[in-house]
Amino acid sequence: MPELPEVEVSRQGISPWLTGIKVTRVVVRDGRLRWPVPGEIQELVDLTIHRVSRRAKYLLLETDFGTADLHLGMSGSLRVLNIGTPAEKHDHVDIELANGKLLRLNDPRRFGALLWTREPAEAHALLAKLGPEPLTDAFNAEYLQGRAKGRSTAIKTFLMDNHVVVGVGNIYANEALYAAGIHPKRAAGNISAERLETLVAEIKRVLASAIQQGGTTLKDFTSADGKPGYFVQQLQVYGRGGQACFHCHTLLSEIRLGQRTTVFCSHCQR
């Protein structure tokens, strides 16, 4: 599943081709995605995309009269191609542009989405109650301590709640907790301010590094130019259950926590 770094890499890849460009045509081959693609998406035609932004894992194509909201779901990907490039299996939507390019959404598992809203993007029901972006100053140790106070929820589950902070998905929660030396099952409200400060710093470092490396390619994700992400080569714990910890050589434990695979070092993480 594409997480925040993968979505940000996609945003960076498509933005130069879309920003300041008029939409000439929207082709919906199969609109049966997570939510049906609305007929109103055709309102995008003849509008100029002024900005390609991201909120959590949503990509926002912003115009003066509305916003197209894209979500990649479990297996979605975007490509910038020349108009006329033949569609392949699972190529569900094309947004054709006045510069001769098109933005193509491919989604084998159909958990992605393409929505249209005339209201400000941040006011949309899917976005309005989300927590802060993890790479902004709004996400800091003081904020996290305030949200965690009195909470018995496991810290990993707590971090993956997008009402607390967006974009800290399973891969990066595993990696950040390992880097911070915090056991994933430790109660969120039972972590000192000093350790939370370390955790926040590691979340920011891990996410920024993943973006710089083009994301993590485990199965489905490739960037807008079709290239894989290389952060997989830097994973310390995720996907390595039963293998030796790189630091202390203890065999890494693998459990299910909040219905998600969780890998940690019982020696290094407390």
UniProtKB/Swiss-Prot annotation:
Catalytic site positions: P2, E3, K57, R260
Reactions the enzyme catalyzes: Hydrolysis of DNA containing ring-opened 7-methylguanine residues, releasing 2,6-diamino-4-hydroxy-5-(N-methyl)formamidopyrimidine; 2'-deoxyribonucleotide-(2'-deoxyribose 5'-phosphate)-2'-deoxyribonucleotide-DNA = a 3'-end 2'-deoxyribonucleotide-(2,3-dehydro-2,3-deoxyribose 5'-phosphate)-DNA + a 5'-end 5'-phospho-2'-deoxyribonucleoside-DNA + H(+)
EC number of this enzyme: 3.2.2.23, 4.2.99.18
Binding positions (DNA): H90, R109, R151
Comment on bound cofactor: Binds 1 zinc ion per subunit.
Keywords: DNA damage, DNA repair, DNA-binding, Glycosidase, Hydrolase, Lyase, Metal-binding, Multifunctional enzyme, Zinc, Zinc-finger
One of the record's GO molecular function terms: damaged DNA binding
The keyword Iron-sulfur is annotated on this UniProt entry: no
Assembly notes: Monomer.
Protein name as annotated: Formamidopyrimidine-DNA glycosylase
Taxonomic classification: Bacteria, Pseudomonadati, Pseudomonadota, Gammaproteobacteria, Aeromonadales
